[in-house]
Amino acid sequence: MSDTFKKFSYYHHSPSAVQKPLEIDLFQKLLKARGESFQFGSPVTIGRAVEDVASAVLVNGMDHKEALRHGTSGLDSHEAVPWEQGEMARLDLPRGDTLEAMSGYAIEAISQALSKANQIKGQERLDKKYAGIVLPFLGYSDFYGGNRVVELKVKTTAVSDSKAGRRAGSLPSKPDSNHATQVAFYADVLNCPATLVYVSEKGFKIFDETNCEELSTPGFANNLKELKARAWARENIMRCAPDTRTLMQMLSPNFQDWGWKMNPEHLEEARAIWGLNQS
């Protein structure tokens, strides 16, 4: 691999990260290269807990109740991150009946999507090199079986307030286009159809080639072209700068993007790159 990309701590393209604004992706890679720890908000923690429980049941054959006991360990250790303070100070991570409901819906939906599978496999590393792009793509699928890959997305609102209480995450009427583009890569590597499963504490929705054009073969082809175009463009941009700081200064940041929700010290460091922390 050329030092052109190593100097940015860029070793591969991710089907999800390549859809982020480049300046956010670069800064996160800079922090990771320094060994900085990342803080994740409660939705990420909840999503991981639901996936862990579903995987324990579907992949490892564990009893649901036993899987729930293991799944709550990550929730118990979660601490509210800085952007969940103030109005969001009363963090209410779902446990007990709520986590049981969400994970139960996940298990039901994934089982339905993979009804033809004799065996369900869990997270799998997937990589592929494409012509015209120097760096390979690397991603991790959630569930696979019966020649179909399933990506699980958990929709939840983890914050309670005195008036409304904690609200359930809303299920989408159609898949998020970024999610559809992400699974296009998995479908391409595994040469199989793909399904997107959305779960909340109120139910689930399943999207596949039968009810979503983006998850059809032509839809995957178009989304894969977009992924490769984004990767190709990033590599071209990285060839134009000597270091991460200079490259980031060539880009225009939008600090309203959720990707900038991070440790305040890290955010201040990022803003300084564009001189935005000066009085």
Question: At which residue positions do the language-model features occur?
Answer:
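Metal-dependent nuclease catalytic cores that hydrolyze phosphodiester bonds in DNA/RNA
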Residues: 1-140, 276
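Short acidic (Asp/Glu) and glycine-rich catalytic loops that position anionic groups and cofactors
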Residues: 28-34, 154-156, 202-208
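Flexible, glycine- and charge-enriched loops at secondary-structure boundaries
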Residues: 43, 172-176, 217-220
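An active-site-proximal "capping" alpha-helix that borders the catalytic cofactor pocket
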Residues: 50, 179-190, 194
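Hydrophobic/aromatic-lined pockets within catalytic cores
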Residues: 54-62, 154-157, 188-191
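Short glycine/proline-enriched coil/turn segments at helix->beta-strand junctions
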Residues: 63, 118, 145-148, 189-193
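Non-catalytic protein-protein interaction segments used by genome-maintenance enzymes to assemble
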Residues: 127-182
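Metal-dependent nuclease catalytic regions and adjoining charged, substrate-binding loops involved
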Residues: 188-279
